[in-house]
Amino acid sequence: MKKLLTLTTGLVAIVLAGMIGVPAQAYEAGPVTGGGTIDGKVVFNDAVPTRKIIPNKDVEVCGGIREEPLIAVGPDKGVQNAVVYLVEVAKGKAWPAAGKTPELDNRKCRFEPEVQVIRAGPLDVVNDDPILHNTHGYYGKRTAFNMALPNQGQRIPTELTRVGTVRIDCDAHGWMEGWIYVVDNPYYAITGADGKFSITDVPPGSYTLVAIQSFTGPIQQPVTVTAGKPTNLTIELKKQ
């Protein structure tokens, strides 16, 4: 069954709360019997807006004046780096195998990765550049962390323990921008260059699915997963 989702203005309270950070909910990992898959594509059908970046310092590292899109859209309208996730999932598949601590890297006056999803917990902030960066994360208007990194190769650990959207700025380079989405369950995906995503091993049942991109903001939609079957979605983002 294929559904077309469009942006709504009456977003559920949990989505709005997630923008400012809420405590992580308990999640029980275990075997999933008869899990289904949510396969989909995120699209943007309007004209792609851009912003003009004018570096006013450290141009030898940061580069020159340039135009950059506010949303990455491919020739078939697929949106890259949109985040899709399920909310209020109390039980299901295991988290991905633990590796190194997630990183937010200041590299050539950009945040790498620009968009990432992490489990509530530790984060390392890194400076790869030979210049000062001041990396500042916000849940809404509330500071999540604020750290000066004057030295190349510097690494500072921090914790993001609340679920929600964290906007990342650099107080030394005002055009830098990144996004971290902190989640409390492993049912999430980031769209590829073609706008497609897949969320696997979802226990049968009804859920709220959220898709979000920094320019358009979030969209939420009920979704029902049937045992052993795929649910196919096309999600259309629009500027709020």
What are these regions (language model features)?
Residues G21-P23:
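N-terminal signal peptide c-region/cleavage motif recognized by signal peptidases
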Residues Q25-Q240:
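Extracytoplasmic copper-binding redox domains, predominantly the cupredoxin/blue-copper superfamily
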Residues T6-G10, A29:
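Hydrophobic alpha-helical segments and their boundary regions
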Residues M1-L4:
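Positively charged n-region of N-terminal signal peptides that target proteins for export
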Residues T9-M19:
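Bacterial N-terminal signal peptides
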